A protein has these predicted regions:
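Bacterial Sec-dependent signal peptides at the C-terminal "C-region" and cleavage site
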Residues: 3-33, 37
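N-terminal nucleophile
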Residues: 27-262
């Protein structure tokens, strides 16, 4: 008898709770899953007015982050594409740079032209990209739906941007490190990546990194504008390995500069 009274008393509440659980499950299953992992990362674009070199660097908790994030051409500029990424932003940005369009206008033009074909699960509001031209002018865009923390910060001849970060300090520290570090552009980009990681970096961890530097006729051998291209695709400590490679390259560069010509 007491069990029946208990059932009568609490049955409405139990039914309501059950209906809420079922509704929540239906909502979860009806929400579209992302077709690909967002390129959650932090990157920096930089320019050295003393040499004319343009560089880009990136680190992320995805495999082979350099495959589709960084774009650069000597005497033209560089682009970084990430977050809910549309990789075509890279070549689009480079084409507009060649036409003499400013980085700020490039950002606007590309966003305006984006058809946003998958607004529910791959929206352009989640995109993040940055542009630097051959004079060091920069601009960046962080969409309101890029996974938090997401943001960008511009400095003198540089722009840093990232998403799924520990906080604003990641990009702020990257800019500070780039501006304050002496030496070749590769060392300044490397310092920026290290500073970003020291501030918390990508909250999911580390896996891959990439550095790309271009300069007109400044690469090794004939007719080569690629000064440096380094990629760590899969490592528990990609920045440690990247720094080793950058320092090894700078040692070799210093030795080559000491060789007599002719």
């Amino acid at each position: 008898m007491q069990n029946r009274k208990w059932l009568i008393l609490f049955a409405p509440g139990l039914l309501m709770l059950l209906s809420l659980v079922i509704a929540a499950r239906q909502l979860k299953t009806s929400s579209p899953a992302l077709p690909w992992d967002p390129v959650a990362t932090f990157s920096i674009l930089g320019y050295d007015p003393a040499t004319g070199e343009i560089g880009a660097a990136v680190q992320s908790r995805v495999f082979s982050v350099g495959n589709g994030v960084l774009w650069a051409e000597a005497g033209v500029g560089a682009v970084a594409t990430q977050a809910i990424v549309d990789v075509s932003y890279g070549p689009q940005g480079m084409a507009l740079l060649k036409q003499g369009v400013s980085p700020k206008d490039i950002i606007k033009r590309i966003l305006d032209a984006d058809p946003d074909p998958r607004p529910r699960d791959w929206t352009k509001k989640g995109r993040q990209f940055a542009v630097i031209d051959a004079k060091g002018e920069v601009a960046a865009y962080t969409g309101p739906e890029a996974t938090k923390y997401a943001g960008d910060k511009q400095g003198k001849y540089c722009t840093a941007q990232g998403n799924i970060l520990a906080g604003e300090a990641v990009v702020a520290n990257m800019v500070k490190a780039f501006e304050e570090t002496k030496g070749h552009l590769s060392m300044r980009l490397m310092a920026a990546l290290d500073a970003g990681q020291a501030a918390g970096g990508d909250t999911r961890g580390m896996q891959s990194a990439n550095i790309l530097i271009v300069g007109k006729g400044m690469g090794v051998w004939l007719n080569n504008d690629v000064v440096l291209r380094l990629q760590v695709d899969d490592s528990p400590e990609p920045l440690k390995e990247m720094r080793r490679l950058v320092e090894a390259w700078n040692e070799r560069r210093a030795k080559n500069q000491q060789r007599p010509v002719g």
